[in-house]
C-alpha cells in the first residue's frame, strides 16, 4: 500500500501522521533538526532555505505553542507566513474546507500547516490537492482531533534522544488522558518505530483506549507500579473539551490517583526526565515542584520544537 505522505521515491511529500512513517524518515528529520537548533542562539536567526515560499497557517482549533513555533520556524527559514484568522474567514460564513483550500492554493500557497478538530482533515486536504493537480503544495498536520500530532511526536523524540542518546534501552511511560490524546498516539508510534523496548500507558480505565496492547504497549491503572524504574515520563493533561459523560469523579481525585508528585517521581530511575506537551495544568496531572524541578525538560521541548518544525518544512520544501 502506498504511503500518502511519501512520493514515489520515498521522500516526504506531506507530514500527516507518524503511523507508518519509515524509521529512516524519522531519523532524517531528527538529524536535520540538530543542524537547526543553534540558529536560535545567533544574532541573526535566519537561513534562506524557504525564501520566496508561502506558508499558510490554518488553525481551526486554539493553539499557543504549536502555532507560535510553526510561525517562528517558518520565519527562521525566511518563508512568507500567512496566519488565517478562521473566525473572520469565509469558513465562518459556510465555505467548505476544500473550497477554502482551493482559494488559498490559487494564491500560490506552497505549504499548509493545518490544525483541525476533525480527525483526518489534513489527509483529506492532501488527497484533494493531489486529485486536483496541486501535489506541489505540501500539508503539515499540526493536530487533527484525537488522531495525530506528528510534529509534537517528533519533537518529543528529539528531546528524548537529546537527553538519553539512544532509544533501544529505554522504558517510557505515558501518563494521563490517553484516550483523547493525539500526542499519545503519535508518541507511541514513534517510540515503537525507533525501537524503544518498553512503552507503558498509565491512567484510569475510562481514559485508556482499547487496542493499546496490540500496539505493543504495557497498560497500567496503578501509577506507582507503572512508574517503577522508567527512564522517561510523558505527562498528559485532561482534555475536558473532548470528553463526553462523566469519565472522572473530579480533577482533585485525578491528581490524588494519577498526578505526578515528587514522591511518585522517586519511583522512576534517578536520572528520569519529565516531559509534557502542554498546556500544563498544575495540581491536576503534575505538581509544581515536579514541573519546575531539575528533572523536568518541558521548556527545552518547546525550544526543540522550533528546530523540529524547521526540519519538517525544510525537507518538504526540497532541502
Curated annotation (Swiss-Prot):
GO terms for cellular component: cytosol. Gene3D superfamilies: Aspartate/ornithine carbamoyltransferase. GO terms for molecular function: amino acid binding; aspartate carbamoyltransferase activity. GO terms for biological process: 'de novo' pyrimidine nucleobase biosynthetic process; 'de novo' UMP biosynthetic process; amino acid metabolic process. Keywords: Pyrimidine biosynthesis, Transferase. Its EC number is 2.1.3.2. Carbamoyl phosphate binds at residues 65-66, 115, 149, 152, 278-279. InterPro entries: Asp/Orn_carbamoyltranf_P-bd (IPR006132), Asp/Orn_carbamoylTrfase (IPR006130), Asp/Orn_carbamoylTrfase_sf (IPR036901), Asp_carbamoyltransf (IPR002082), Asp_carbamoyltransf_Asp/Orn-bd (IPR006131). L-aspartate binds at residues 93, 182, 237. Heterododecamer (2C3:3R2) of six catalytic PyrB chains organized as two trimers (C3), and six regulatory PyrI chains organized as three dimers (R2). Catalyzes the condensation of carbamoyl phosphate and aspartate to form carbamoyl aspartate and inorganic phosphate, the committed step in the de novo pyrimidine nucleotide biosynthesis pathway. Belongs to the aspartate/ornithine carbamoyltransferase superfamily. ATCase family. NCBIfam families: asp_carb_tr (TIGR00670), PRK00856.1 (NF002032). This is Aspartate carbamoyltransferase catalytic subunit. It comes from Herminiimonas arsenicoxydans. The lineage of its organism: Bacteria, Pseudomonadati, Pseudomonadota, Betaproteobacteria, Burkholderiales.
Amino acid at each position: 500500500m502506498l504511503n500518502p505522505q511519501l512520493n514515489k521515491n520515498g521522500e516526504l511529500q506531506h507530514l500527516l501522521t507518524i503511523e507508518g512513517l519509515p524509521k529512516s524518515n524519522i531519523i532524517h528529520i531528527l538529524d536535520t533538526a540538530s543542524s537547526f537548533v543553534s540558529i536560535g542562539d545567533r544574532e541573526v536567526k535566519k537561513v534562506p532555505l524557504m525564501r520566496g515560499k508561502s506558508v499558510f497557517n490554518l488553525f481551526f482549533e486554539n493553539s499557543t505553542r504549536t502555532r507560535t513555533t510553526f510561525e517562528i520556524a517558518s520565519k527562521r527559514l525566511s518563508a512568507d507566513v500567512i496566519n488565517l484568522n478562521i473566525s473572520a474567514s469565509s469558513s465562518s460564513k459556510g465555505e467548505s474546507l476544500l473550497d477554502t483550500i482551493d482559494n488559498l492554493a490559487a494564491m500560490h500557497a506552497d505549504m499548509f500547516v493545518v490544525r483541525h478538530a476533525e480527525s483526518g482533515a489534513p489527509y483529506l486536504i492532501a488527497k484533494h490537492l493531489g486529485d486536483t493537480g496541486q501535489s506541489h503544495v505540501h500539508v503539515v498536520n499540526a493536530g487533527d482531533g484525537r488522531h495525530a500530532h506528528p510534529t509534537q511526536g517528533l519533537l518529543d523524540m528529539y528531546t528524548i534522544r537529546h537527553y538519553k542518546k539512544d532509544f533501544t534501552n529505554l522504558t517510557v511511560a505515558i501518563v494521563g488522558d490517553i484516550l483523547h490524546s493525539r500526542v499519545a498516539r503519535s508518541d507511541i508510534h514513534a517510540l515503537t518505530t525507533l525501537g524503544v523496548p518498553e512503552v507503558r500507558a498509565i491512567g484510569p480505565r475510562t481514559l485508556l483506549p482499547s487496542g493499546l496492547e496490540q500496539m505493543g504497549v504495557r497498560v497500567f491503572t496503578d501509577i506507582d507500579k507503572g512508574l517503577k524504574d522508567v527512564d522517561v515520563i510523558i505527562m498528559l493533561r485532561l482534555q475536558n473539551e473532548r470528553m463526553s459523560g462523566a469519565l472522572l469523579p473530579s480533577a482533585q481525585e485525578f491528581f490524588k490517583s494519577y498526578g505526578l508528585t515528587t514522591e511518585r517521581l522517586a519511583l522512576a530511575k534517578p536520572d528520569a526526565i519529565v516531559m509534557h506537551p502542554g498546556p500544563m495544568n498544575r495540581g491536576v496531572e503534575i505538581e509544581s515542584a515536579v514541573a519546575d524541578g531539575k528533572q523536568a525538560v518541558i521548556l527545552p521541548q518547546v525550544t526543540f520544537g522550533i528546530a523540529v518544525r524547521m526540519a519538517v518544512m525544510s525537507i518538504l520544501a526540497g532541502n
